Amino acid sequence: MAAQIPIVATTSTPGIVRNSKKRPASPSHNGSSGGGYGASKKKKASASSFAQGISMEAMSENKMVPSEFSTGPVEKAAKPLPFKDPNFVHSGHGGAVAGKKNRTWKNLKQILASERALPWQLNDPNYFSIDAPPSFKPAKKYSDVSGLLANYTDPQSKLRFSTIEEFSYIRRLPSDVVTGYLALRKATSIVP
């Protein structure tokens, strides 16, 4: 194994191994620096180069091992995946083409025109023929005078109001006007 260790090339100064992380002016690169410090560095450097040579050899052996023992290309059996349809054909939409295509929204006139062009029957359901169940949310109550959201109801006339000014206005109304407001809301008049 000693015969296979690669020879590490040195730079112009013999016996000094340069570490690429250190600057050239550092004392470890200087052969004439203090006493045994430089010699011990040289020994450590040569030991590390020896270890590098072994690791390089091991790496080269590891690279060659799979090629020697390989029995050729290994083909896996083409097993169909249960979630993929083998008869699926792409429609051409999607992928890189989909990002480039400009998608525009249809306006209301275009939607209505396309719905009119469809062959509707008289008994087909539409938004007006569907009987929806009553909502679970409580119905919003609006003022009979101003149309704003009304949190209050006058107990005498049963008209709804939202502010104090509306309440004072409702109290001064004659009974026929109160009946007219209630008729607009389709509420029965309780006031005789």
UniProtKB/Swiss-Prot annotation:
PANTHER family: INO80 COMPLEX SUBUNIT C
Record note on quaternary structure: Component of the chromatin remodeling INO80 complex; specifically part of a complex module associated with the helicase ATP-binding and the helicase C-terminal domain of INO80. Component of some MLL1/MLL complex, at least composed of the core components KMT2A/MLL1, ASH2L, HCFC1/HCF1, WDR5 and RBBP5, as well as the facultative components BACC1, CHD8, E2F6, HSP70, INO80C, KANSL1, LAS1L, MAX, MCRS1, MGA, MYST1/MOF, PELP1, PHF20, PRP31, RING2, RUVB1/TIP49A, RUVB2/TIP49B, SENP3, TAF1, TAF4, TAF6, TAF7, TAF9 and TEX10.
Intrachain disulfide bonds: none
One GO biological process term: regulation of DNA strand elongation
Spans annotated as Disordered: 1-44
Classification via SMART domains: YL1_C
Source organism: Homo sapiens (Human)
Annotated function: Proposed core component of the chromatin remodeling INO80 complex which is involved in transcriptional regulation, DNA replication and probably DNA repair.
Keywords: DNA damage, DNA recombination, DNA repair, Nucleus, Transcription, Transcription regulation
Subcellular location: Nucleus
Protein name, as recorded: INO80 complex subunit C
Domain of life: Eukaryota
